[in-house]
A protein has these predicted regions:
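Conserved class I S-adenosyl-L-methionine
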Residues: 53-61
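Conserved SAM-binding motif I beta-strand of class I
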Residues: 76-81
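Conserved short alpha-helix immediately C-terminal to the canonical SAM/SAH-binding motif I
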Residues: 85-86
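Conserved SAM-binding loop of SAM-dependent methyltransferases across substrates and taxa
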Residues: 62-74
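S-adenosyl-L-methionine
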Residues: 1-54, 89-117
Length: 117
């Protein structure tokens, strides 16, 4: 099992995740670019805001930010979206990552509007 040791390593891991096949324009669904996700998460990591912390990926879509948090050592990540199909993709993406990397944190998937979280 591998570990993430750099921002570029994180970007590569995130680039392997599945995106939306048919994004719903009405709810502004899109897949976050892996480089942007890696940049944001790496900045938070450098500030000590991810390792051993609980994260919430609100409006998670395909789960790139929550999965990135788990890759960087978050103790738990909540994945919240009001679209069951998006959560299904996020769960599949987590399985992909777990097959390659050691993930010790827990994941919780919630189908809910973020206002109800």
């Amino acid at each position: 099992m591998g570990q993430i040791r750099s921002k570029s390593g994180l970007a590569i891991a995130l680039s392997r995740l599945k995106g939306f096949e048919r994004p719903k324009v009405s709810v502004e669904q899109y897949t976050m670019d892996s480089e942007i996700g890696a940049f944001v998460l790496w900045q938070a990591t450098l500030k000590g805001d991810i390792a051993q912390k609980v994260s919430a990926d609100l409006g998670c879509g395909t789960g790139i930010l929550g999965i990135g948090c788990l890759l960087l050592g978050a103790s738990k990540a909540y994945f919240v979206d009001n679209d069951e199909h998006a959560l299904k993709i996020a769960k599949e993406n987590l399985k992909i990552v777990k097959s390659e990397f050691l993930i010790e944190g827990k994941a919780s998937f919630l189908c809910n509007d973020i206002l109800g979280f």
